[in-house]
């Protein structure tokens, strides 16, 4: 479960970007204590130049054996790729490994959400590292790739996150607090009213109402001309 505190992109990988031959992304704080990518980012797109506004749809706390496949069906039908931040112990439950394999094969981005959904900021460095590495191992076993992108539970980063150049911590800019309600309509309303180009939407695929809301959000925003991308494309393109 999330605290509801909205925080945006946490970009702590300047050296990694230099290594990849890309200019570092500039970041700034806005009045809501969220971090937003500056004018070099997708938020600076001139939509009037016939460039589609883009947003990223992200899901935490999965996979869930019953609700996640329904979500994947809806996204596939609409040709939408999303980003899933997975809890390691959930991946290992039941038949969930098959769901993760499907996510990967259908082009979704898979990220790390720790092994037990712990507050990384309250753990010793070694314990926090273990939480992340356990989930890395579980995901890599299925996809063949170690996740680079991380969403810290509750938005609370580990104490040494600035030194961890192998990970990119991703936050959010639109949080409808879907885990607090079963009213899918209310979730949809919040997202549609708050959305702007370049936003990162936070939802949870473990709740049926959130899955219903996600599909309706996709339909409404696609109708408004939005394109959905994974977070790597949002911050690196």
Protein language model annotation of sequence segments:
Residues 32-121, 127-128, 138, 146, ...:
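Active-site beta->alpha N-cap acidic-glycine motif
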Residues 118-227, 232-237:
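Catalytic domains of cell-wall/extracellular-matrix polysaccharide-remodeling enzymes
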Residues 21-34:
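Membrane-interface motif at the C-terminal end of an N-terminal transmembrane signal
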Residues 24-27, 41-42, 46-49, 77-79, ...:
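C-terminal domain-boundary segment and adjacent tail
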Residues 1-16:
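N-terminal Sec-pathway targeting helices
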């Amino acid at each position: 479960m999330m605290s509801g505190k909205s925080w945006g992109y946490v970009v702590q990988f300047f050296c990694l970007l230099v290594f990849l031959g890309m200019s570092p992304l500039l970041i700034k704080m806005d009045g809501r204590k969220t971090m937003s990518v500056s004018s070099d980012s997708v938020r600076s797109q001139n939509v009037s130049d016939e460039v589609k506004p883009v947003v990223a749809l992200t899901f935490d706390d999965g996979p869930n054996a019953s609700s996640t496949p329904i979500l994947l069906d809806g996204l596939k039908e609409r040709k939408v790729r999303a980003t899933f931040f997975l809890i390691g112990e959930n991946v290992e439950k039941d038949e969930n490994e098959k769901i993760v394999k499907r996510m990967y094969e259908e082009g979704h981005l898979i990220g790390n959400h720790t092994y037990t959904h712990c507050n990384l900021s309250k753990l010793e460095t070694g314990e926090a590292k273990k939480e992340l590495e356990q989930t890395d191992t579980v995901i890599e076993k299925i996809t063949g790739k170690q996740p680079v992108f991380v969403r810290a539970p509750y938005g609370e980063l580990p104490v040494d996150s600035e030194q961890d150049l192998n990970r990119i911590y991703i936050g959010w800019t639109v949080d409808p607090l879907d885990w607090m309600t079963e009213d899918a309509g209310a979730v949809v309303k919040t997202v549609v009213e708050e959305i702007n180009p370049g936003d990162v939407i936070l939802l949870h695929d473990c709740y049926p109402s959130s899955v219903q809301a996600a599909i309706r959000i996709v339909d409404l925003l696609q109708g408004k001309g939005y394109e959905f991308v994974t977070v790597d494309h949002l911050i690196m393109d």
